[in-house]
UniProtKB/Swiss-Prot annotation:
NCBIfam families: rplS_bact. Belongs to the bacterial ribosomal protein bL19 family. This protein is located at the 30S-50S ribosomal subunit interface and may play a role in the structure and function of the aminoacyl-tRNA binding site. GO terms for molecular function: structural constituent of ribosome. The keyword Ribonucleoprotein applies. This is Large ribosomal subunit protein bL19. Keywords: Ribonucleoprotein, Ribosomal protein. GO terms for biological process: translation. Signal peptide: none annotated. One of its GO terms (cellular component) is cytosolic large ribosomal subunit. It holds the Pfam family Ribosomal_L19.
Amino acid sequence: MRQNTILENVTSAQLRSDIPEFRAGDTVKVYAKIVEGSRERIQLFEGVVIKRKGSGIQATYTVRKISSGVGVERTFPLHSPRVEKIEVVRFGAVRRAKLYYLRALQGKAARIKERRRDV
């Protein structure tokens, strides 16, 4: 058996199928499990997806939000069991795959138009 086939068999079992379609510019709610001492709880992180990277089991996405006037970015593995669920709040209309320019913007300048969805 080829090494590539073995690798695909191992990773295909770990891929998640409950992930909604989203891309850079979309606002998402990420419910992440965090461990505090002996307790495990779910922490909500809501913000704009500024990038998606990789494919397969290595795929990641970065979410940016403003918390108490400070920009906070968190990168999550797409297929991580530590992420309980992902909800898409709104679909953003952007023309870039990586939205690093949002780091320099603040207030109304950092707003993203909503993408029209055909029903």
